[in-house]
A protein has these predicted regions:
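Helix-loop boundary and gating motifs at the non-cytosolic
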Residues: 11-78, 234-278
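Intracellular juxtamembrane helix-capping segments at the cytosolic ends
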Residues: 135-149, 337-349
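A membrane-interface helix-boundary motif in multi-pass transporters
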Residues: 179-205
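Glycine-rich segments within core transmembrane alpha-helices of 12-TM secondary carriers
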Residues: 157-179
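C-terminal ends and interior cores of transmembrane alpha-helices
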Residues: 102-117, 307-324
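C-terminal membrane-cytosol helix-exit motif in multi-pass small-molecule transporters
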Residues: 202-222
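Hydrophobic core of transmembrane alpha-helices in multi-pass small-molecule transporters
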Residues: 39, 118-138, 244, 323-340
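Helix-to-loop junctions at the C-terminal end of transmembrane segments
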Residues: 79-93, 179, 285-298
Length: 349
């Protein structure tokens, strides 16, 4: 399907908004269903990425517990990718996708139900979150590929990126302010763990609604084909080495912010504020780089992102103070979009 252009009326903001809604309605049904699903789940991802770590830090102050949780998460992801290939032969892809979203709420509920945080319970919650990520990402890209074509893919990814940016700005700020205010003002009799449980309910509700929406789609499951390989093209092996570098940096992204901010800077409010400001900076930076760079700049952009991570880590290691954390977070905020912008186009090529 070719992208269609709807001329918007020269009215106010509401007229233009209705014009965009009408334009959205011109796209295929499955594409619209998937976009609405991803829009809802975009408001869940910042919660599970940021505030599970702060919950562990607040209730245990054990850095090893946060690391153990993340190790469990990233152990569960590749295992789920493998088993998902078998399950897709017998289970509808929308059900697997929905199951992945619902498991994120289950993982948080398991964590909140632990009377005393112990490493065993944290690892169980982490493995469940790894299953969630695995089922979610293993099926999301196929659904996007099968629901779009070359003519409307730019619109799809543009709108999806817009949803993700809005969620990355709004959710950390709001959740961080809510949790911080609970601790500072004694809401719920000063029981901040109850506030975390309310956040978990919020996650559950969104995942249930998102699952109901995606199940309305008429998505076809992929053909039964081989999905396990042991020999790869030389170019693919080079890509995997690049992925290792990105994975090392990704470990800092998911682990370091909550530990460092809760230990050296402040509380959930500080973390949420830093992440919201960072999301705005990232959005502007990505737009400018996407607008003014070309394919020949990709390796340089990726390398600049890695260099920023290294510089931020060095500053934090030397200073190990609130100032060092802020410098590290700034480098992380600038380095992450640089790495994504350089890496993903190389991957798709």
């Amino acid at each position: 399907m070719k992208e269609t252009t709807v001329a918007g009326p020269k009215g106010g903001i509401f007229s233009r908004a209705f014009s965009e809604i009408r334009h959205f309605g011109t796209y295929p049904f499955n594409m619209r269903v998937l976009l609405l699903t991803n829009m809802l789940y975009a408001f869940v991802l910042p919660v599970v990425e940021l505030f599970v770590g702060t919950y562990i830090m607040r209730n245990s102050s054990e850095l090893a517990y946060v690391v153990g949780y993340q190790l469990a998460v990233y152990t569960g992801i590749p295992l789920t990718f493998f088993f998902n290939g078998f399950l897709m032969r017998h289970v509808r892809i929308t059900h697997l996708y929905s199951f992945g979203m619902l498991l994120s709420g289950v993982s948080m509920a398991v964590m909140m139900s632990l009377e005393t945080l112990a490493l065993g319970g944290i690892i169980v919650a982490g493995l469940i979150m790894g299953l969630s990520y695995g089922f979610f990402w293993a099926n999301r890209d196929f659904l996007a590929l099968s629901s779009t074509d070359d003519g409307n893919r730019n619109y799809y990814y543009g709108l999806e990126s817009f949803f993700n940016t809005v969620a990355s700005v709004v959710v950390p700020g709001m959740i961080g302010a809510f949790l911080g205010a609970t601790a500072d003002h004694g809401w719920f009799a000063g029981n901040i763990n109850f506030a975390y449980k309310l956040v978990t309910v919020f996650v559950f509700v969104l995942t249930i609604v998102a699952s109901a929406v995606v199940c309305r789609g008429r998505f076809a499951s992929p053909a039964r084909e081989r999905f396990v390989y042991f020999r790869f093209d030389r170019l693919w092996n080079k890509m995997m080495r690049l992925a290792v570098l990105k994975g090392i940096a990704q470990g800092y992204i998911v682990t370091a912010p909550s530990m460092l901010v809760m230990t050296l800077v402040g509380n959930e409010t500080t973390l949420g504020t830093l992440q919201s400001i960072g999301a705005l900076v990232s959005a502007v930076l990505l737009y400018l780089l996407g607008r003014f760079t070309s394919s020949r700049h990709r390796v340089a952009i990726f390398s600049a992102g890695l260099l920023l991570f290294a510089l931020g880590g060095a500053f934090n290691a030397v200073l190990y103070s609130a100032t060092g954390v802020i410098v590290f977070m700034l480098c992380l905020v600038l380095g992450r979009p640089l790495m994504d912008l350089g890496y993903f186009p190389i991957q798709l090529r």
